[in-house]
Regions:
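Short active-site-adjacent helix-start/loop capping segments
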Residues: 3-5, 59-60, 87-90
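Short, glycine/charged-enriched secondary-structure capping and boundary segments
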Residues: 9-10, 64-67, 93-96
Length: 276
């Protein structure tokens, strides 16, 4: 996989407002460079920011778990894009007893070496998938929403995220066919540690309810098949987050979520994984 990325770069396809067809962004046509390598060859201390973009159980894989140890030892600010908020991030929520949550993780010891002040969370709201008949360097965005990241504990580290936020906001993609385009997926930075937890309600009301005893169902059907049941699940999860200390404004209104879910005509990745 690394060889393909290094030889061909990456290709991301996404819908853009005002365009009938998907817009294809090829990394080879952009400034900067993209490099891929195997876990044992990565030196985290050489980077300004580490992004953990897999799901929590995958970090226990041989080679990857050793890399995670080096990331923690490096002291480099780390942003997780995971459905499951990692233990160091949960430790940043005032009053939350994280010791009782350790059984929820495949290998909780993996995260013990991280400084909570160096960990933040980014809600993985954009829906994307790898087309099954394409190479692994191709990604297709199904629902282009924004990434929502919480600030780091240290404003120096947060400034790096805010610079990324501003740079992405100002950037325009020069399409050979359509000229300068504003791409829809942004990075937004918030002061509240609860903003990335908005994903919890979406997962419980939609993604995980795609799982059925005999078959999967699309997220759209999971949410809209019984809209009031979905609303009840969604509002209950948001209520838990508010009881933990969040503000109602930290979370996405159910109506906005339900409207977005109506475009999700495939089962969630969690349902597909369980279905084998």
């Amino acid at each position: 996989t690394a060889a393909i990325f290094n030889a061909e770069g990456s290709t991301v396809r996404m819908p853009v407002r005002g365009q009938e067809d998907l817009i294809e962004v090829d990394s080879g046509s952009l400034p900067g460079s993209l490099q891929a390598t195997s876990p044992e060859k990565v030196a985290p201390a050489e980077f300004d920011l580490v992004v953990l973009a897999m799901q929590e159980p995958q970090y226990s894989a041989a080679g990857v778990r050793e890399l995670i140890g080096r990331v923690a030892a490096s002291g480099v600010p780390t942003m997780a894009i995971t459905n499951m908020p990692l233990l160091p991030y949960l430790a940043r929520i005032p009053g939350l007893e994280t010791a009782s949550l350790r059984p929820c993780f495949l290998e909780p010891e993996l995260w013990d070496a991280f400084d909570p002040d160096l960990m933040t969370l980014c809600s993985p709201d954009p829906q994307a998938f790898r087309p099954p008949d394409e190479k692994p360097n191709v990604l297709q965005v199904r629902l282009p929403t924004n990434f929502k990241a919480a600030a780091f504990a240290n404003e120096v580290h947060t400034a790096m995220l805010r610079n990324l936020d501003a740079g992405i906001e100002a950037a325009r993609f020069e399409s050979p066919e359509h000229g300068a385009l504003e791409l829809p997926v942004k990075l937004r930075v918030y002061d509240s540690v609860f903003v990335p937890l908005a994903k919890w309600a979406m997962l419980m009301a939609g993604n995980y309810r795609c799982v059925r005893a005999e078959e999967m169902r699309p997220i759209k059907d999971a949410v809209h098949g019984d809209l009031e049941a979905s609303r009840a699940v969604y509002d209950w999860v948001v209520g838990v987050c508010i009881e933990l200390g969040g503000d109602a404004l930290d979370f996405v209104p159910f109506e906005k979520y339900a409207n977005a879910a109506s475009a999700l005509a495939s089962p969630s990745s969690a349902a597909r994984a369980l279905a084998g």
